[in-house]
Amino acid sequence: MGTDKSQLLIEQESFTQHIAKTLFNITNSVTVVGRNVDDSNLRVAMDVYPRWGALGGLHGALNACQREWAIVVACDLPFVTIELFELLMKERAGYDTVVPIQPDQRPQPLCALYRIRPCLEHATALIEMGKRRPLDLLEAVNTRWVSFSEIEDLPQAQNFFLNINTPADYYEAIKKAAALKT
């Protein structure tokens, strides 16, 4: 898209602030992983493996987490809700990750729950082997795949995985956010 998506505005706040506000309803700690983070009220962690793509960012999030589990959300998924994460949290017993499946049947590893210890160990090993895909991590640990049919009845479920990759996507997100407010 040519710009830092985390700082795009939706409802007069950055995507990062918007997502953090949602997460603060279910946790008291939100950490942003990356460079040039301007949201001063949030804890910031740097990538351990800079420029290693999504798996590197995921590793940075897991490495920075001080709890048993981490909720990981990409900065370009501004329509996630508390209800989605509450449902995912109910599914974690006996698993290392809980990952929703999008309507197009693809997993969404950047909107998921991760048990820190096993996932960090596997993410480190995968990176050291030259791997870059979060899906490699999900296949290496005990993953609970949550089908879209299990979450489709949640409020706003059709919007959860609308990520912002183009200026047109951003324009549509602004319109959708305005429509959801009314």
Region roles according to the model:
Residues 1-131, 136-160, 171-181:
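Nucleotide and nucleotide-moiety/phosphate-recognizing core
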Residues 165:
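Active-site rim beta-loop-alpha module in soluble metabolic enzymes
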Residues 168:
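Adenine-nucleotide cofactor-binding loop residues
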